[in-house]
């Protein structure tokens, strides 16, 4: 099994995230980190259920651990980090594109994983499996405090 960038190893930041180690740039409080952990472990379990292999399990878990790393950051601090196509987006959705950009700057080249993190709040027709899974897991993780009317019965 290979990583989506074609290599047999994960980038060190991705590998660390898959073990629950957040990057230095993370701006997320305790409850947010708990949410990220639940999403990461839910994604790991889904990848395992798919028999995707250890590398894919780690990738999927990392997506969950990384998706909200900048969720508690001030949107005005995130705007300079994001691609110009996101500049008119609401502040609450900038954390995904900003986190993906900081991961790129750190040397992460896994396009599917970066796209998943970048668009996890809005969704994207270009999602790979990890993107689709992250989009669902972020909403469905068991600790999420969403109003009952949004949940299927």
List the predicted regions and their residue ranges.
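Alpha-helical protein-protein interaction elements
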Residues: 14-17, 38, 52, 59
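Divalent metal-dependent catalytic cores for phosphoryl transfer on phosphate-bearing substrates
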Residues: 22-27, 34, 44, 49-153
């Amino acid at each position: 099994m290979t990583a989506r960038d074609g290599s047999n190893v994960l980038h060190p930041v991705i590998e660390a995230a898959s073990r629950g180690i957040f990057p230095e740039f993370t701006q997320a409080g305790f409850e947010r980190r708990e949410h990220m952990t639940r999403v990461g472990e839910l994604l790991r379990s889904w990848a395992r259920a798919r028999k995707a292999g250890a590398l894919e399990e780690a990738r999927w878990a990392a997506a969950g651990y990384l998706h909200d790393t900048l969720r508690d950051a001030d949107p005005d601090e995130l705007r300079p980090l994001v691609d110009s196509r996101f500049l008119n987006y609401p502040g609450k959705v900038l954390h995904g594109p900003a986190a993906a950009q900081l991961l790129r700057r750190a040397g992460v080249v896994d396009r599917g994983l970066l796209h998943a993190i970048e668009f996890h709040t809005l969704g994207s027709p270009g999602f790979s499996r990890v993107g689709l899974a992250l989009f669902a897991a972020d909403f469905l993780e068991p600790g999420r405090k969403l109003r009952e009317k949004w949940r299927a019965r």
